[in-house]
Amino acid sequence: MSNWPSSRAQQVLAALLRIGWTIKRQSGSHRTLSRPGWPDFVFAFHDGEEIGPSMLARIAKRTGLTPNDL
């Protein structure tokens, strides 16, 4: 069982912005996020889209997001 709950993309993006990621550029629903010391990350979800636990775990691995950040 995953520690990650399902979350809306808008909530995940807000959590990433709170932990220091910034939107570098955007093309449609694809947002390129940047944070010092981390490689750029492409967040490609529509705001209302549901992101499941396994995808959240993959996002966390590349961004440093934790379940408590949500």
Which residues fall in each region the model found?
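Basic nucleic-acid-binding interfaces
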Residues: M1-L70
